[in-house]
């Protein structure tokens, strides 16, 4: 009798807790880490195209999405086409989306990757893997840093994400 009562009580508590957790509003976006306190981003230089040096200061005033990737990274191969489609969306035309290859690949190898995966809306950027890894505390690829209009990191995505996920799109528009 006690066992039956305990099983019934467990089921009731489970059902109540499940309904409560669904009623709390929070983003359910896999791999998104939202910072409680915004972090000021330091200016750093990297290379655009084959040889043009640029810095994060070149991209002020608009939301900034920095995606760190490499040609040899399997999740990056899956993620990059959705990042490219994100840049093509009208709501994101004013966003600066910067994919920086920090895998030690040359511009030519990055260009070949972009051609192979039909990446048409993004530019090619390259940077020093160790320097960026240390500055941004990157522990794996892909890693995406989300920076608001004021130059503060408000969150990051660690690992693969589908940039066409509607809940992510809504969060980006609201918070960057």
Question: Which residue stretches match the model-derived regions?
Answer:
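Hydrophobic beta-strand anchors of alpha/beta hydrolase catalytic cores
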Residues: 65-66, 97, 144
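Short active-site neighborhood of thiol/selenol oxidoreductases, capturing the structured segment around
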Residues: 55-77
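Structural microenvironment flanking redox-active thiols in thiol-disulfide oxidoreductases
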Residues: 78-117, 128-134
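Bacterial N-terminal signal peptides
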Residues: 8-18
């Amino acid at each position: 009798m006690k066992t039956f009562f305990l099983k019934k009580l467990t089921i009731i508590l489970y059902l109540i807790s499940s309904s409560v957790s669904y009623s709390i509003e929070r983003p359910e976006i896999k791999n998104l880490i939202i910072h409680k306190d915004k972090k000021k981003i330091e200016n750093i230089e990297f290379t655009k195209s084959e040889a043009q040096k640029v810095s994060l200061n070149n991209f002020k005033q608009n939301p900034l999405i920095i995606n760190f990737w490499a040609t040899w990274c399997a999740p990056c191969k899956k993620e990059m086409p959705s990042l490219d489609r994100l840049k093509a969306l009208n709501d994101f035309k004013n966003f600066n989306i910067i994919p920086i290859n920090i895998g030690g690949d040359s511009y030519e190898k990055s260009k070949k990757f972009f051609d192979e995966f039909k990446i048409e809306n993004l530019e090619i950027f390259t940077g020093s893997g160790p320097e960026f890894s240390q500055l941004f505390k990157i522990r794996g690829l892909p890693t995406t840093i989300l920076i608001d209009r004021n130059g503060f990191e408000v969150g990051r995505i660690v690992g693969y994400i589908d940039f066409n996920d509607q809940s992510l799109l809504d969060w980006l528009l609201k918070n960057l």
